[in-house]
């Protein structure tokens, strides 16, 4: 049972900072931001230290590729935030605004058709950071997928980018065999050899 009594304004303020009240307790979870899910070994250690020092020792990963430190008492929230900021990280990712940008590993994945890390980092700077104080009617989610395999589900976001392969036709190499390799590998049957 929770014995903590917070005003609605204080709850809203904390949520806007990235602190979410843990159901039935006086504790909070804090969302530590990542840029497209990438964190360094030093950041991992700092997050683990923060979880053990301020929370209940548990880290969870969100669908927006942020890391939640759970079980932080209300009276330790400010100290926790200072610790995280001193480690070069930030908390946030909640509220009616642009949410943290998610990305697949298309930059390094064998199926990646674009540099998903670079694109999502640019979008993060321009929209997550650039529009950080802009109040929206609802949360706005952005995802960058490196290929049509859809691992990060860009089509389920408010704005999704999906890498595509564009076949290049070189007429001078075509022998007119009517066994086009593009047609043979198109899983949707969208590419067809035609006399037109």
Language-model features: locations:
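Intrinsically disordered, low-complexity polar/charged tails and linkers
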Residues: 1-25
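Small-residue-enriched alpha-helical segments and adjacent helix-cap loops
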Residues: 4-6, 30-168, 173-176
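Short, flexible, solvent-exposed loop/turn segments with mixed acidic/basic and small polar residues
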Residues: 19-24, 55-61, 189-194
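Iron-sulfur cluster-binding cysteine motifs and their immediate structural context
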Residues: 179-196
